């Protein structure tokens, strides 16, 4: 890892952080305006956005939100009390607890998601531009061969303009 940073590096990182924070602030205000806390909204969105085949269980949501299991349980408890999510027993394993959004939860999440999407239409280009500047800075500093994430977040080695290969794990 390169250790030297330029003033431009700091400026581009600060600009990216600023645009991320602006969007997060928008989100917090929108969510609280509907009587929820940001983590509650994040859990509802994570639940609705789970990839197909992923079991909607607390362990999975805790991983998605990068929080501890007991914190996810508390969020689910509050959302359940508020009528936003419900627990159901698993069909094959009755010990398993599956989570679903209630109609109220679906309605509120849809409203928030529409607001977030509209805000991203406005703020997205500046956020994307800030991210591109940071990534260009990284790429220019490490040269033509660099491990950079693809659109799935997987790191791939870019070798010249035509070839891509997965970096070896033996580092």
Task: Annotate the PLM regions.
Residues 77-135:
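Charged, amphipathic alpha-helical coiled-coil/dimerization segments
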Residues 1-34, 82-84, 150, 156, ...:
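N-terminal leader segment of winged-helix/HTH proteins
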Residues 1-7, 118, 129-171:
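C-terminal regulatory/oligomerization modules of transcriptional regulators
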Residues 58, 76-77:
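Short, hydrophobic-biased segments on the C-terminal half of alpha helices
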Residues 20, 37-43, 105, 120:
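The N-cap/first-turn positions of alpha helices
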Residues 25-68:
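N-terminal helix-turn-helix DNA-binding core of bacterial DNA-binding proteins
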């Amino acid at each position: 890892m390169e250790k030297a940073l330029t003033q431009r590096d700091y400026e581009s990182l600060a600009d990216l952080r600023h645009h991320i924070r602006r969007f997060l602030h928008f989100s917090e205000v929108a969510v609280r305006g509907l009587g929820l806390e940001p983590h509650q909204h994040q859990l509802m969105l994570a639940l609705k956005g789970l990839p197909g085949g992923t079991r909607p269980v607390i362990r999975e949501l805790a991983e998605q939100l990068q929080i501890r299991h007991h914190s996810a349980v508390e969020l689910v408890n509050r959302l359940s009390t508020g009528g936003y999510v419900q627990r159901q027993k698993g069909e094959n394993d009755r010990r398993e607890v599956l989570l679903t959004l209630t109609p109220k939860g679906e309605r509120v999440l849809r409203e928030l998601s529409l607001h977030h999407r509209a805000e991203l239409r406005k703020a997205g280009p500046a956020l994307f531009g800030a991210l591109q500047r940071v990534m260009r800075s990284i790429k220019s500093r490490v040269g033509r061969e660099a491990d950079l994430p693809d659109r799935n977040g997987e790191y791939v080695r870019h070798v010249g303009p035509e070839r891509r290969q997965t970096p070896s794990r033996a580092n």
